[in-house]
């Protein structure tokens, strides 16, 4: 059976750290910023580490060969 391909969209959205955790940009920042608190906007500015179960799903289904 051939190797599973890495999903191109996942390559652009996720990064795997050296310890195997998955980093992604914070969600909820496309529009509607007026109603959001300043704390939310500040905290969502950078990247965040996904929860362990979500990270495992991303690696298994979308990034089988790592990055």
Curated annotation (Swiss-Prot):
Q: Recorded GO terms, molecular function? A: structural constituent of ribosome
Q: Which GO terms describe its cellular component?
A: cytosolic large ribosomal subunit
Write the record's keywords in alphabetical order, separated by commas.
Ribonucleoprotein, Ribosomal protein
Q: Does the keyword Ribosomal protein apply?
A: yes
Q: Name one GO biological process term.
A: translation
Family in the record: Belongs to the bacterial ribosomal protein bL35 family.
**Could you tell me what this protein is called?**
Large ribosomal subunit protein bL35
Provenance organism? Rhizobium rhizogenes (strain K84 / ATCC BAA-868)
GN (gene name):
rpmI
């Amino acid at each position: 059976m051939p190797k599973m391909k890495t999903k191109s969209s996942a390559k652009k959205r996720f990064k795997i750290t050296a310890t195997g955790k998955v980093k992604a940009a914070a969600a909820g920042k496309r529009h509607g910023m007026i109603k959001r608190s300043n704390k939310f906007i500040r905290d969502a500015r950078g990247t965040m580490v996904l929860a362990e179960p979500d990270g495992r799903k991303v690696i298994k289904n979308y990034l089988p060969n790592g990055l």
